[in-house]
């Protein structure tokens, strides 16, 4: 991916939510299930580029699709010589006695940007001092957290933002259906929302805009899972139309500048 500073006429577009995996590996994969006829196949960066490049998408932040610790390294190895992969949001369990050691191990790689947790682990971290300390380690390392869950999780996201102001948090797969985003999240500048929830309506996007504004919304496709909803072209085109109507400045923020602030990915 060319340096952003050199792309004045043609801005980069960064997809902050893709998954890569290979069931043909000797060890297989923990996800997706063999019973999923759409997703259970080898999905690698070259496959993503085939659907994304025609729309001007220049890079991606890969999000974990495996609870196996060594699969963090598997993605980092994929990214080593592939400049379209800007980084990984990995998987580490705050309940693990090895969390600190694994975090230190992976944080040495500049492409390791943070981890993803679902609603239950986030709630447990807020209640358990040891697990909470592990999330603070994440912030102290300059890394971030992707949060995935239902609307009920958002109260805990706000609590976490209050207790660890240095931790950048990206809420995955919004808008929810029906749209539901607490206005209180507007007060936390370190909390971002990733529009990766399928084909949101204008009203749903308006609600997100009212809470996060032009500085804290980021683009993510959720490919290849998004194929269950619509082709990549449709997913992209839906948000492209909405944010283009907001003007060039807002559009650039949505498609790459905000994600750079949230993930601290660097051009390669």
Model region roles, listed by residue range:
Residues 1-16, 41-59, 207, 213-218, ...:
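Mid-to-C-terminal alpha-helical segments outside catalytic/metal-binding sites
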Residues 3-137, 141, 179-180:
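Mid-domain alpha/beta scaffold segments of enzyme catalytic cores
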Residues 18, 65, 119, 174, ...:
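Active-site metal-binding loops of divalent metal-dependent hydrolases
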Residues 20-22, 176, 200, 225, ...:
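Active-site micro-motifs of SAM-dependent methyltransferase domains
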Residues 69-70, 97, 152-155, 234:
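Short alpha-helical
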